[in-house]
């Protein structure tokens, strides 16, 4: 019994050391394997089945319970990533809803401002147009432009007045053509006016010459009339003197008159 107990103790002491060595070898081998390595670890650990009465079995169970395998880590990471994605989605939805609400508010305010600005701009434009139309009407009333109207196009009042004025000018020019010698219808306006000016100047010269002659004739007539008046006055005085002498000496005058007979 003593030998069995000593052998059992040595077996029990040697088994954990062997198990630790095997675990170190398997871990070293696990580090050399490429991922995925969950199935290889499971195969390594579960193919080596130990009896239940070994004390290392509890250690193996503890090791399986305490160590997190990569499959568990992957599951945890996937769950955490899913949770993060859900959180992100919820945050993005909240941000998008807030942005949409803010954008709607800004659009409503901007549309209201645009409508107000549009009304103000339309009012300003209408007032400006009214002012411009009034200014244009005033300018049209002030400006009087005489435009030469063609035949059949006398529609404006100014063009009608211009047409009437030109008709009167043409009538007067026809009268001058009949009066002034050397003026013909085939002549131009400039040559016709030159002929009329020359004719008027010649008439002025003739009038001046005739006026000089009239002044000379009138002066001569005045001198002759003065001499005739002096002579008539002298004759009248001589007759009066003769008559006075006869009244004083009537007999002598009678004798002289008788002798003369």
Curated annotation (Swiss-Prot):
Residues 72-82 have a biased composition (Low complexity). Disruption phenotype: No visible phenotype. Redundant with BEE1 and BEE2. Pfam families: HLH. The keyword Repeat does not apply. Residues 135-146 have a biased composition (Basic and acidic residues). It is found in: Nucleus. Residues 95-123 have a biased composition (Polar residues). This is Transcription factor BEE 3. It comes from Arabidopsis thaliana.
